[in-house]
Design a protein with these regions (language model features):
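Conserved phosphate/ATP/ADP-binding segment of small-molecule kinases
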Residues: 146-230
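Conserved phosphate-binding/catalytic region of the ribokinase-like
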Residues: 197-299
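Short beta-strands and strand-loop turn motifs
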Residues: 101-103, 128-134, 162, 180-185
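Glycine-rich phosphate/adenosyl-contacting loop at the front of the ribokinase-like
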Residues: 1-56, 64-66
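Gly/Ala-rich phosphate-binding loop of Rossmann-like dinucleotide-binding domains
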Residues: 47, 153, 262
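Hydrophobic alpha-helical segments and helix pairs
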Residues: 108-123, 127-152, 158
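Charged helix-capping and loop-helix junction motifs
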Residues: 115-118, 142-149, 195-201, 236-241
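Conserved N-terminal subdomain of the carbohydrate kinase-like
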Residues: 24, 48-128, 295-299
Length: 299
């Protein structure tokens, strides 16, 4: 079973307008609403790839109920911890000539709620996959990723960590099955600017030496690179298409890779991850099955 964790789920309210004038009343041409948060995005794309998952995390208030109901209608299992106070956040994304985002803060998460999440995670079994993605809300302990991986270290669980900087570096000692920084994040972690494939490979291998089992590096227009558990390097080019959306492309890549490794080998997983990321980038929302399959054929 695949489990995803989203600490701070959101409703993304996307507003399209021809021209945005600050300080004036603006009217939208159209609106969309999506249920978001990095782990939730992964669960949604996994569903498109016929992989069942269960979304964990925290929800609060009427917006939290809307998120849970919406995911249920999409066929996604959830087991969120319900917070007593506050509301799950709403992120406003304004798309005009320029794209503007105003992201909500989200509810406070107390120790009791954290312990309830830990209790749910303690039930994971050998062979399960756990995907941790995204930043940590201010009300959570900064080492919660470490605490989760430490609790599960005695089990044979595939852990996927999609985070950056110290959040990522501090969990490498627990040997996560997959990490996915992009090339810029990789450079930031080591205080260097990476200018070519050789340098990217060098520092990706450093992360592997520090404990990561597989290191997946997304490189935007230059494709993706994977250093697998055997130290072999795999490369994949980019999908061709018009970029419409940057939100969720990385999460989609994680979903595609996870589905691919459950269904095939590393080469296939890298291609499926690349296709899923591209399908989201070329769509208004998250990747759909037909677009993923179409792009996969081109890789």
């Amino acid at each position: 079973m695949v489990y995803t964790v989203t600490f701070n789920p959101a409703i993304d309210y996307v507003v399209h307008t021809g021209e945005m004038k600050l300080g004036s009343t603006n009217r939208s041409d159209r609106e969309e609403m999506y249920f978001g948060g990095k782990g939730i995005n992964v669960s949604i794309v996994l569903r498109e790839l016929d992989i069942q998952s269960k979304a964990l995390g925290f929800t609060a208030g009427f917006t939290g109920e809307a998120i849970e109901n919406g995911l249920a209608e999409m066929g996604i299992d959830t087991d969120f911890v319900h917070l007593q106070n506050g509301n799950s956040r709403i992120n406003v994304k304004i798309k005009s000539a320029e794209e503007t985002e105003l992201n909500g803060q989200g509810p406070d998460i107390d120790d009791e709620a954290v312990n309830k999440l830990f209790a749910k995670l303690d039930k994971l079994q050998d062979g399960d996959t756990l995907i941790l993605a995204g930043s940590i809300p201010a009300s959570l302990p900064s080492d919660i990723y470490e605490k989760i991986l430490e609790r599960l270290a005695h089990k044979n669980i595939r852990t996927v960590v999609d985070a950056t900087k110290d959040l990522l570096l501090n969990v490498l000692k627990y040997k996560p099955f997959l990490i996915k920084p992009n090339n810029h994040e990789l450079g930031e972690m080591f205080g260097v600017t990476l200018t070519n494939d050789e340098e990217i490979e060098k520092y990706a291998r450093k992360l592997k030496e520090m404990g990561a089992v597989n290191v997946l590096i997304s490189m935007a227009g230059d494709g993706a690179m994977l250093i697998d558990e055997n130290g072999e390097i795999h490369r994949c080019g980019v999908c061709n298409g018009k970029v419409k959306n940057s939100v969720g492309a990385g999460d989609s890549m994680v979903a595609g890779f996870t589905a691919g490794i459950l269904q095939g080998d590393y080469e296939y997983a890298l291609k499926l991850g690349t296709a899923a990321g591209g399908a989201t980038a070329f769509s208004d929302g998250l990747a759909q099955k037909e677009k993923i399959a179409e792009l996969l054929e081109t890789l």
